[in-house]
């Protein structure tokens, strides 16, 4: 669950066009096996240097670890994950996206990788999620190790979703 530390983040925000789709496929370890032009354009990467790289090359440090734990736990169960993700472009800029990530299966039903489609997110939802993620990050920073950080951050996310009376996926879909 490492973050992209080789790029210096900036305050430059990129906005996805309403009809833009960012599509990637990864193997079981999260290494990119396919990236569409939309992904390459918004992340400011080229295909040659992107394929086989870990998908976390676009991970923004403002993303709580607990969100990625939830993502991986959901996918490993064979379930579909929805999330609002702040990604980082190769120049340090960022963009918010509504992500739908699903397992990919072979003919025998075995998970062989993951398929991600991201699109522009609702601004109202981004503002809510931004505040929630900031609270989660603060909780993570107060812990002495990743395990405790994820537990503290997950509790905040769980408490928020319990207040809403729905799961994380259901909450996000309600804004779609």
Please place each PLM-identified region on the residue numbering.
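Juxtadomain coupling helices with adjacent low-complexity linkers
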Residues: 112-176
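Sensory/regulatory domains in signal-transduction proteins
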Residues: 2-137
């Amino acid at each position: 669950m490492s973050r992209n530390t080789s790029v210096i983040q900036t305050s430059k925000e990129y906005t996805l066009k309403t009809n833009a789709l960012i599509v990637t496929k990864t193997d079981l370890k999260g290494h990119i096996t396919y990236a569409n032009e939309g992904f390459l354009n918004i992340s400011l990467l080229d295909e040659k240097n992107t394929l086989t790289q870990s998908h976390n090359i676009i991970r923004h440090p403002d993303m709580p670890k607990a969100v990625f734990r939830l993502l991986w736990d959901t996918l490993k169960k064979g379930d579909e994950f929805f999330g609002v993700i702040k990604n980082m472009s190769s120049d340090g800029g960022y963009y918010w996206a509504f992500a739908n990530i699903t397992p990919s299966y072979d003919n025998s039903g075995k998970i062989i990788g993951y398929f991600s489609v991201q699109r522009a997110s609702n601004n109202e939802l981004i503002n809510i999620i931004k505040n929630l993620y900031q609270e989660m990050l603060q909780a993570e920073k107060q812990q002495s190790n990743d395990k405790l950080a994820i537990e503290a951050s997950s509790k905040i996310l769980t408490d928020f979703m319990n207040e809403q009376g729905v799961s994380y996926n259901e909450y996000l879909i309600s804004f779609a």
